[in-house]
Swiss-Prot record:
GO cellular component terms, A-Z: large ribosomal subunit
Organism: Staphylococcus carnosus (strain TM300)
UniProt-recorded Gene Ontology molecular function terms: rRNA binding; structural constituent of ribosome; tRNA binding
Coiled coil: none
Pfam families: Ribosomal_L1
Encoding gene, per UniProt annotation: rplA
HAMAP family, alphabetized: Ribosomal_uL1_B
Subunit field text: Part of the 50S ribosomal subunit.
GO biological process: regulation of translation; translation
Protein name per its UniProtKB record: Large ribosomal subunit protein uL1
Keyword Nucleus on entry: no
């Protein structure tokens, strides 16, 4: 394991590893201990007590954060005709059909999110082995397979984030930048936490939020007190 630098260790020393902080205090401390020399991303990790091997306990979705993420998302839309025109008018960065499928197969990935109308999924489905491992495959659960491409593009541009529980039941997501106010980050956090709480599978019994931590790019993790989380 690589040794941590003095700057990181100094920052980490401000965090009590045995303490579980309120959401506001955790975010404030994460901002204070950011060690990056750029506007770092503020991230949250939710460890859930679920079994993702069971189909009814696979959690995936998307939510528009009230204050966005601070990141400009490049959107590629697979659509044709009027729907292509709608996507362009809504601000999509790239709109097309098979020509973009060919570019992707040739190694082009200058985009962050892919949206597709249902009739284009036959074309997009062929890219599954390429887009899937990168988490870029459109999915109805995240609103990226839809006829309402205008809404999809506008929400993504406004700060929509996707969330998905990994094998260990952990959801990683960005809730903004260090430059955001603590209040805005708290509102983003609460919005994400609320939608994950509402997604609790009926078959998941007992404790749901096993642990939660807030961190910044390259910064130390700060544990969050989950005792007041609503379910």
């Amino acid at each position: 394991m690589a040794k941590k630098g003095k700057k990181y260790l100094d920052a980490a020393s401000k965090v009590d590893r045995n303490e579980h902080y309120s959401v506001e205090d955790a975010i404030s401390l994460a901002k204070e201990t950011s060690v990056a020399n750029f506007d770092a991303t503020v991230e949250v990790a939710f460890r859930l007590v679920i079994d993702t091997r069971k189909n009814d306990q696979q959690i995936r979705g998307a939510v528009v954060l009230p204050h966005g993420t601070g990141k400009t998302q490049r959107v590629l839309v697979f659509a044709k005709g009027d729907k292509a025109s709608e996507a362009e008018a809504a601000g999509a960065d790239y709109v097309g059909e098979s020509e973009y499928a060919t570019k992707i197969q040739q190694g082009w990935f200058d985009f962050d999110v892919v949206v597709a109308t249902p009739d284009m999924m036959g074309e997009v489905g062929k890219l599954g082995r390429v887009l899937g491992p990168k988490g870029l495959m459109p999915n109805p659960k995240t609103g990226t397979v839809t006829m309402d491409v205008k809404k999809a593009v506008e929400e993504i541009k406004a700060g929509k984030v996707e969330y998905r529980a990994e094998k260990a039941g952990i959801i990683h997501a960005s809730i903004g930048k260090v430059s955001f106010s603590t209040e805005d980050l708290v509102e983003n956090f609460n919005t994400l936490q609320d939608v994950i709480a509402k997604a609790k599978p009926a078959s998941a019994k007992g404790t749901y939020f096993k642990s939660v931590a807030v961190t910044t790019t390259m910064g130390p993790g700060v544990k969050v007190d989950t005792s007041n989380f609503k379910l």
